[in-house]
């Protein structure tokens, strides 16, 4: 039998052994991978800037109800339960509970007024006290219902946006209506002998009507996108105690 004296074909890739000079290998790789530099340095800078922009994730987006969360727990205070047609305003669970508190307050004031034994006094004796109560009630109403609630929705970008003034005006109009109902309840209770229960009922109903304001938590005002394209909140704004 004839022996096969054919030499092996030369491989394009250089075989690397233990005795290979690694400095030569690295220099060879640099020479093969080196691309010709452009003559214009501005074009090279533009190419680098474009590549760096493409590598960064886009951070500009509009937060929605599903993306607004604290950690892994959804922000349940803003989950819509009822939504009125034609009005960009939603009722959460806490606001529904606060509405029940106001209705119970109305029922209690009606019960007090319907009892003739509780109205045996002259209103002129308490006129100064009535004016003071109404003034303090108006101050609390403006601070709680107007300012904090308005700024809360502006910072969270949930239902209202900064550019959408129409939705903000509708929501503020509804707040004014609820404020008028609350003031009517306060004045009704003030014209009875149960003046001392006016402020506890008002504070109680206000805290439940605007439940997120009664908790010391940081509202998520900054949203980010990670490398995978998923939306997440800033780590500094993650709440330690998740809502029940």
Curated annotation (Swiss-Prot):
Residues 35-49, 235-244 have a biased composition (Polar residues). Keywords: Membrane, Nucleus, Transmembrane, Transmembrane helix. Disulfide bonds: none annotated. It is a multi-pass membrane protein. Its main location: nucleus. Residues 30-49, 224-244 are annotated as: Disordered. This is Uncharacterized membrane protein C70.04c.
């Amino acid at each position: 039998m004839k022996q096969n004296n054919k030499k092996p074909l030369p491989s394009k890739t250089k075989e690397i052994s233990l005795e290979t000079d690694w400095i030569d290998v690295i220099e060879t790789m640099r020479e093969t991978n080196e691309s010709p530099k452009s003559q214009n340095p501005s074009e090279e800078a533009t190419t680098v800037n474009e590549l760096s922009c493409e590598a960064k994730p886009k951070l500009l987006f509009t937060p929605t109800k599903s993306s607004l969360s604290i950690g892994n727990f959804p922000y349940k205070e803003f989950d819509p339960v009822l939504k009125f047609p034609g009005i960009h305003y939603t009722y959460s669970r806490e606001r529904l509970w606060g509405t029940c508190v106001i209705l119970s307050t109305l029922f209690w004031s009606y019960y007090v007024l319907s009892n003739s034994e509780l109205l045996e006094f002259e209103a002129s004796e308490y006129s100064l006290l009535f004016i003071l109560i109404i003034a303090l009630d108006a101050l609390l109403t403006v601070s709680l219902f107007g300012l904090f609630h308005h700024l809360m929705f502006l910072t969270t970008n949930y239902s209202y946006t900064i550019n959408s003034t129409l939705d903000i005006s509708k929501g503020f109009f509804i707040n004014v209506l609820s404020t008028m109902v609350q003031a009517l309840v306060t004045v009704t209770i003030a014209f009875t002998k149960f003046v001392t229960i006016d402020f506890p009922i008002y504070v109680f109903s206000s805290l439940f009507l605007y439940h997120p304001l009664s908790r010391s938590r940081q509202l998520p005002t900054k949203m980010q996108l990670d490398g995978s394209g998923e939306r997440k909140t800033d780590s500094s704004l993650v709440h330690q105690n998740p809502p029940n």
